[in-house]
Amino acid sequence: MKLHELSDNDGAAKKRKRVGRGPGSGTGKMGGRGIKGQKSRSGVAIKGYEGGQMPLYQRLPKRGFNKPNRKAYAVVNLGLIQKFVDAGKIDASAAITEDALIASGLVRRKKDGIRVLAKGDVTGKLNIEVTGASKSAIEAVAKAGGSLTVTAPVAETSEA
């Protein structure tokens, strides 16, 4: 086998059909679109328009609500914090603050604060200070002999 002998399998590369290129091509003049009307033009139909029938998006009831002052927390699991402590990326002798979690690379952005959840095992004594935590996370840290303190989020001051 040589490079110049290589070719696609039969039917693998389908030739493009050039439409509207004269009567001799077989797909000239109307180009397979039929005669006149909106569907024969480019752009075809208006999205969501159902020909005068009440459109689906109007037939269904409105639902839901977006809370304007919703808090978005960066979520961290206890198992990950323990993993970073074991790897030496977080110093467990001092209090583990939100700034320490960001500096270690465990959390990229703080958002409205950091919330700790109980997934994973805690083997050592950890003293954690964060904006939010689940009840089970607080219990798990206390069971391991540490403390999980939930602090009030710091309000961002805007300079006008």
Swiss-Prot record:
One of its GO terms (molecular function) is structural constituent of ribosome. Signal peptide: none annotated. Residues 21-35 have a biased composition (Gly residues). GO terms for cellular component: cytosolic large ribosomal subunit. GO terms for biological process: translation. Residues 1-13 have a biased composition (Basic and acidic residues). The keyword rRNA-binding applies. It comes from the Bacteria. Keywords: Ribonucleoprotein, Ribosomal protein, RNA-binding, rRNA-binding. It holds the Pfam family Ribosomal_L27A. Residues 1-42 are annotated as: Disordered. SUPFAM superfamilies: Ribosomal proteins L15p and L18e. Part of the 50S ribosomal subunit. Binds to the 23S rRNA. Belongs to the universal ribosomal protein uL15 family. This is Large ribosomal subunit protein uL15. It comes from Roseobacter denitrificans (strain ATCC 33942 / OCh 114) (Erythrobacter sp. (strain OCh 114)). The gene is rplO.
